[in-house]
């Protein structure tokens, strides 16, 4: 388990809906400092918040951020973008762009900050995933989150010897700028972040932060046909 009280927290994608909540609630829970990392850092009105330039798609930027924020004990790997769909016809450059941010960018942050966390006692690395890690329907976004989920599982084992708590945070649609154009039920970002921090402090390694993530995880062992009824039974076409 990792306590947020007394921690030094780094949040990537700190300018977005979830990012702002991660910053605010870390301070509410007693974090002594929060690095608010973003490609174009914004100003904050709290001296405990340190704006930090970090472009997750730029290796030099990630390395410099890890050097500058060397006292970090909790990393919230939150930066992400939406993606094109369907994946069968989207431009490859667009798909690669999503993978660069959501997978390779998040992995770069994890790799460069792992030694920082080790030096500071282990701490926690939290990868913000999605129900899209487990289900299709969101094109390149689903593919990128599935890749990061797999990497999270590997990182959990690889960083265990240095006592780093590696957490996969899963959530469904959340009311953020990324989902502004979608007319679907959305969870309040404040609820997601509260559940995330509570899970971290409880020592959880996988956090299902809302109803949709809990429901999707529960049915993963079902057949492909059960999870995707729109497919029907392809064998019927052969009879």
Show where each model-derived region lies.
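Residue(s) in the substrate-gating loop at a strand-loop-helix junction
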Residues: 130
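Conserved NAD(P)H cofactor-binding loop of Rossmann-fold oxidoreductase domains
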Residues: 78-84
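N-terminal Rossmann NAD(P)H-binding glycine-rich loop of SDR-like oxidoreductase domains
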Residues: 15, 19, 23
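C-terminal helical subdomain
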Residues: 168, 176, 180-219
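Substrate-binding pocket helix/loop in short-chain dehydrogenase/reductase
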Residues: 86-87, 94-96
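Active-site helix of classical SDR
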Residues: 110, 144
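Rossmann-fold cofactor-recognition segment
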Residues: 46-59
